[in-house]
């Protein structure tokens, strides 16, 4: 027999497994939804991405969850993805958005062995800039509740944790320089370095951000708008720094290379200063780089999260443990100080991306999708 939900809702075939596809704890699943779609390749997010309002809500397969997104994360690399830089074989139109957190509203039979409707889950997978996203149960992460703080760990937190763990060789007393330290991933690099008993220097762009860095344990915040970073490092750290966590690129990268101590390690997790350019790159003094590294027995180490998925789950467990103990601050920026106010709804993803590239955010930029949920915030 065919069971019909409320007007405008999806029809559900009432078979022995039908209960696995019912949203019995919330409103009926609609037929259509809104989502963001890349319709042309460009690093200009406004030119590349279109908000579509009448997309079919996808059905979960046997091993899948249908997640109603409540919060989605903004990443500097969103415009790299919209420009087609990560997968040249991917042609428009395609979905966008790397991470989300919300509630399970439907699921396949196999997925129901581990998950239930109404459960809070987070995930890192393409297509989060949508009201609903199908997520393989195998990559979903159960969460205590639908809080934006948990979202900050998915990309930003794990990038800092795994890069420092695998490449940083942190130990007590080492000096660590974190660029863009008050941003989404920088905040984690600062705190994880302090947990490792390192001395941490962090660059930022305002006195307010410097105060935030102090509050999370940064030993020497540097507001580069009022203090030349190069001068501070030369005067206060004449022997150099042991580790650099670098995400800015360009002139900041060159400065970081010069600041390395003997046997220092520079970890490149990004170069946001170049992402908006046609090439996606920021010019550096590459010609002299081999000589500078050689003279110090220093090393340059790249980090791309996708290459460390085998250790992703353990990293998330560690971050969740630190947060639960109160040893980790997960700062969320929902746009309260943005020109157009708080980021609410998929249409505000465009404003949130713009805001990120003004450099004014403190912590992880997050957009709220206002759905009724049963989880307590």
UniProtKB/Swiss-Prot annotation:
Domain of life of the native organism: Eukaryota
Residues at which NADP(+) binds: 185, 205, 209, 224, 247, 269, 275, 303-305, 361
Tissue: Widely expressed.
GO MF term set: 15-oxoprostaglandin 13-oxidase [NAD(P)+] activity; zinc ion binding
Main location: other
Keyword set includes Glycoprotein: no
Stated name of the protein: Prostaglandin reductase-3
